[in-house]
Swiss-Prot record:
GO biological process, one term: Mo-molybdopterin cofactor biosynthetic process
Superkingdom: Bacteria
Cofactor: how and how many bound: Binds 1 Mg(2+) ion per subunit.
Cofactor: Mg(2+)
Family note: Belongs to the MoeA family.
Gene Ontology cellular component annotations, sorted alphabetically: cytosol
Protein name: Molybdopterin molybdenumtransferase
Length: 419
């Protein structure tokens, strides 16, 4: 078999080539309760102000601020309570000279009142109370439209729907939401050395860990996943299963078969399905032979058969492709700074991604490699919540150095930071 020529490109360029392709999913309508993690297909515009009316942020008394002027410890001013309202109720009383309405949090400010006195700022009697300080106009009042005004864009097209966005959608009465349909993914593990999870181990064989891992990563994004039977190193059957997967899915992910060995058929498979290879080598470790192709609006990802390299390839390349297909506003991985807490002395001719454990402390983020960090490592992935990104050309890093990390999980808070 002819060895395919491979010219490594930088990670950022590889991602850019992926998101430069013309690929998009159609808009669909889903129930609000099913919209979590989808991408909005349209701007959401405020149809009324928030708050809708002047309201009280506290339990207390609504008064006229002018009546409180001159109040002090030596000159307490008395008010007469003329009404009592809770959230959802509206007083029909007009607050007059030295009058007040007992008001609960969230209730609409009654006519005539322009300030709220909290209960703890008063001395109450049966139907009166006194205060010892003056209040200014609009003090302790949440004003109509102070957060959002009619016509404001409150959620943008391309925004990920998180729980906060669901609260906004519910506020404006969206029982159904127009979103971008999420792509479906086919996962195909390849290699004659692979056994299924429930198979008995044999000499020279390993269980297929990449297939279940990729499925979990895709489902974590909310994607529909199709799992195909583990493929042996056979070109004809490989071509057939990839063609079948392309007919049913928007993204096809294969693991294994991307190196330069005698049984790595992926280049021939891409040729058979007439896919354009966007790149077949990336200047990074692990996963340098990650290959991505594109045809008819669909992506084909050839990820390494080594688990850590496979995981890295999904995080760096599959995730941005999914976001791009869904029209997300942000597609590139988010990078934050962290302090390396252990030496990592291995030289890095290419950009190196290390599975690691990050912790967010009051002094900033810290990070520790999560164990054995060769490309074939499995256990280190389970104990990692980020990847450390070490630039190519470096000769290793010492504890105390500032490094770039990409969070892959959100459980990075130190216990002492929790309330």
């Amino acid at each position: 078999m002819v060895v395919e020529k491979r010219n490594p490109i930088p990670v950022k360029e590889a991602i850019q080539r992926i998101v430069n392709q013309q690929s998009s999913m159609p808009a669909i309508t889903v129930a609000l309760e099913k919209s979590l993690n989808h991408i909005l297909a349209e701007d959401i515009v405020a149809t009324y102000d928030i708050p809708r009316f002047d309201k009280s942020p506290y339990d207390g008394f609504a008064i006229r601020s002018v009546d409180s002027q001159g109040a002090s410890g030596q000159n307490r001013i008395e008010f007469k309570v003329i009404d009592h309202i809770g959230a959802g109720s509206v007083s029909d009383k007009l607050v007059g000279d030295h009058e007040a309405v007992r008001i609960m949090t969230g209730a609409q400010i009654p006519n005539g009142a322009d300030a709220v006195v909290m209960f703890e700022q008063t001395i109450e009697l049966e139907d009166t109370f006194t205060i010892r300080k003056p209040f200014s106009k609009n003090e302790n009042i949440s004003l109509k439209g102070e957060e959002t005004k009619t016509g404001d864009v409150v959620l943008k097209k391309g925004q990920v729907i998180n729980p906060g966005a669901i609260a906004v959608l519910a506020t404006y009465g969206y029982a159904e939401v127009k979103v971008i349909k999420q792509p479906s993914v086919a996962v195909i593990a390849t290699g004659s050395e692979l056994l299924d999870v429930n198979d008995v181990l044999e000499d020279g064989k390993i269980r297929n860990s990449n297939g279940p891992m990729i499925r979990a990563l895709a489902e974590k994004l909310g994607l529909e996943v199709g799992i195909y039977k583990t493929q042996k190193d056979d070109l004809d059957s490989g071509i057939q299963v990839v063609k079948e997967a392309m007919e049913k899915h928007d993204i096809v992910i294969t693991t294994g078969g991307v190196s330069v060995g005698d049984f790595d058929y992926l280049p021939e498979i891409y040729k058979a399905v007439k896919a354009e290879v966007l790149f077949n080598k990336v200047a990074m470790r692990p996963g340098s032979v990650t290959t991505v192709a594109f045809v008819d609006g669909k992506y084909l990802f050839g990820l390494s058969g080594n688990p850590s390299a496979c995981f890295t390839g999904f995080e760096l390349f599959v995730k941005p492709a999914v976001k791009h297909m869904c029209g997300a506003l942000e597609v590139f991985p988010q990078i934050i700074k962290a302090t390396l807490m252990e030496d990592f002395t291995k030289a890095n001719p290419f950009t190196r991604f290390i599975r690691a454990k990050a912790t967010l402390t009051s002094a900033g983020a810290t990070v520790v490699p999560s164990g054995f960090n060769k490309s074939g490592a499995v256990v280190a992935i389970a104990h990692a919540n980020c990847m450390v990104m070490l630039p190519g050309g470096s000769r290793g890093f010492k504890a105390g150095h500032t490094v770039d990390i990409i969070l892959t999980e959100s459980d990075a808070a130190e216990e002492e930071l929790l309330l």
